[in-house]
Amino acid sequence: METLLLVQLFHELALKGKNRPFFLKRAKAHVRRALKGLGVALEGEWPMALLFRLPEEAWPEAKARLQDTLGVERFARVHRTPPDLEALKAALEKALEGQAFGSFRITAKRSDKAFPLTSPEIERALGAFVKGKTGAPVRLKGAEREFVVRVLPGAALLEVERHPGPGGLPPGVSGRVVALLSGGIDSPVAAYRLMRRGAEVVLVHFHPFPLLSGASREKAKALAERLARFQHRLRLHLVPFSEVQRHIIVEAPTAYRVVLYRRYMLRIAEAIAREEGALALCTGDSLGQVASQTLENLHAVNQAATLPVFRPLIGWDKEEIVAEAQRIGTYATSILPDEECCTLFAPKHPVTRARLEVVLETEARLPTEELLALALKEREVLTYTWPGKPLPEEPEGAFIMEHGPA
């Protein structure tokens, strides 16, 4: 048995002007890639929506995947009927089987202006039908159940199960960014927020192995695997940082260690960005959350970078960040115990108002170029793909219509 799946794209994609075809093409390719391996076939295509046919047993997995697919506004299982009121009533009657609800509403969207009834007339006729079958009252606001009917040229679609997508732009339409991944709660959320804005994110994790265990590397791998669900193809650079730390510990004032760690991390991330063709860096900083994230310290750290440093969470509080981490599925991994670079030999009383002259004087005593070259040479690069290899080019034979689901 088969089912039909209607996928609607994020509303912002309709506002892209001359670049709109590029954004829509990337969004649709991202949706098709998300559904790879489930036996789906493209039934219909509109500027802002796709209609697929898939096996009934594939629906639960398709639903789970689309809930993580950036660029999707919403999606629904639908029944397709002839563009006829009686056919819609028959489909509604079938959809009502086994359902109970205290209130409902009908929402009609008529793209086919040749259909003899207006959208309000369709809503009234079908609303009276459902009320007669169930006894439930119509409630236009706050209805317990909503049935959406779309009347298209040559067909009508009845949504029987609707779910929200994550929204956002498809990955890669806004360029490439290198994101520093600490293994904590904040940095995976920051990377995700940039993915939602269309950035293709490359992850860089700094680990203290072999000075400490490899636990932080394993956490970074698990987080990268989770984040790959949103981007579908993702690279993770695992950079050994212990040699840099050894030199900083010897030369730097104790209170300045973390500031110097972070400056060297930005330099290494910038070198990776040049290799990757990325135009910006990303961190999970939140202003004032910890000592290293005071305005003075962020200024001192930023001075080491020449690329823009994006901080998507700069105005978020911890509760907001935790809630987002739980929503995107990174929180449980982020709170696992590990030993990360910035906690290694961390000072008991870190500086909160770093003076740039002290930072620069300390760095003048360090073999910066040698340390950067060594860290880059010893790194490991992993690639994650999800849910598999990219799809082939758009299959031929799917019909394309100008007017469709809104």
Curated annotation (Swiss-Prot):
<feature type="binding site">
    <location>
        <position position="284"/>
    </location>
    <ligand>
        <name>ATP</name>
    </ligand>
</feature>
<feature type="binding site">
    <location>
        <position position="262"/>
    </location>
    <ligand>
        <name>ATP</name>
    </ligand>
</feature>
<keyword id="KW-0808">Transferase</keyword>
<dbReference type="GO" id="GO:0005829">
    <property type="term" value="C:cytosol"/>
</dbReference>
<dbReference type="InterPro" id="IPR049961">
    <property type="entry name" value="ThiI_N"/>
</dbReference>
<dbReference type="InterPro" id="IPR014729">
    <property type="entry name" value="Rossmann-like_a/b/a_fold"/>
</dbReference>
<dbReference type="GO" id="GO:0005524">
    <property type="term" value="F:ATP binding"/>
</dbReference>
<keyword id="KW-0547">Nucleotide-binding</keyword>
<comment type="similarity">
    <text>Belongs to the ThiI family.</text>
</comment>
<feature type="binding site">
    <location>
        <position position="293"/>
    </location>
    <ligand>
        <name>ATP</name>
    </ligand>
</feature>
<protein>
    <recommendedName>
        <fullName>Probable tRNA sulfurtransferase</fullName>
        <ecNumber>2.8.1.4</ecNumber>
    </recommendedName>
</protein>
<keyword id="KW-0820">tRNA-binding</keyword>
<dbReference type="InterPro" id="IPR050102">
    <property type="entry name" value="tRNA_sulfurtransferase_ThiI"/>
</dbReference>
<dbReference type="InterPro" id="IPR049962">
    <property type="entry name" value="THUMP_ThiI"/>
</dbReference>
<dbReference type="GO" id="GO:0000049">
    <property type="term" value="F:tRNA binding"/>
</dbReference>
<comment type="pathway">
    <text>Cofactor biosynthesis; thiamine diphosphate biosynthesis.</text>
</comment>
<dbReference type="GO" id="GO:0052837">
    <property type="term" value="P:thiazole biosynthetic process"/>
</dbReference>
<comment type="function">
    <text>Catalyzes the ATP-dependent transfer of a sulfur to tRNA to produce 4-thiouridine in position 8 of tRNAs, which functions as a near-UV photosensor. Also catalyzes the transfer of sulfur to the sulfur carrier protein ThiS, forming ThiS-thiocarboxylate. This is a step in the synthesis of thiazole, in the thiamine biosynthesis pathway. The sulfur is donated as persulfide by IscS.</text>
</comment>
<feature type="binding site">
    <location>
        <begin position="205"/>
        <end position="206"/>
    </location>
    <ligand>
        <name>ATP</name>
    </ligand>
</feature>
<feature type="domain" description="THUMP">
    <location>
        <begin position="60"/>
        <end position="162"/>
    </location>
</feature>
<dbReference type="GO" id="GO:0009229">
    <property type="term" value="P:thiamine diphosphate biosynthetic process"/>
</dbReference>
<dbReference type="Pfam" id="PF02926">
    <property type="entry name" value="THUMP"/>
</dbReference>
<keyword id="KW-0784">Thiamine biosynthesis</keyword>
<dbReference type="InterPro" id="IPR004114">
    <property type="entry name" value="THUMP_dom"/>
</dbReference>
<dbReference type="GO" id="GO:0004810">
    <property type="term" value="F:CCA tRNA nucleotidyltransferase activity"/>
</dbReference>
<dbReference type="InterPro" id="IPR020536">
    <property type="entry name" value="ThiI_AANH"/>
</dbReference>
<dbReference type="Pfam" id="PF02568">
    <property type="entry name" value="ThiI"/>
</dbReference>
<dbReference type="Pfam" id="PF22025">
    <property type="entry name" value="ThiI_fer"/>
</dbReference>
<dbReference type="InterPro" id="IPR003720">
    <property type="entry name" value="tRNA_STrfase"/>
</dbReference>
<keyword id="KW-0694">RNA-binding</keyword>
<dbReference type="GO" id="GO:0002937">
    <property type="term" value="P:tRNA 4-thiouridine biosynthesis"/>
</dbReference>
<dbReference type="InterPro" id="IPR054173">
    <property type="entry name" value="ThiI_fer"/>
</dbReference>
<keyword id="KW-0067">ATP-binding</keyword>
<dbReference type="GO" id="GO:0009228">
    <property type="term" value="P:thiamine biosynthetic process"/>
</dbReference>
<dbReference type="GO" id="GO:0140741">
    <property type="term" value="F:tRNA-uracil-4 sulfurtransferase activity"/>
</dbReference>
<keyword id="KW-0963">Cytoplasm</keyword>
<feature type="binding site">
    <location>
        <begin position="180"/>
        <end position="181"/>
    </location>
    <ligand>
        <name>ATP</name>
    </ligand>
</feature>
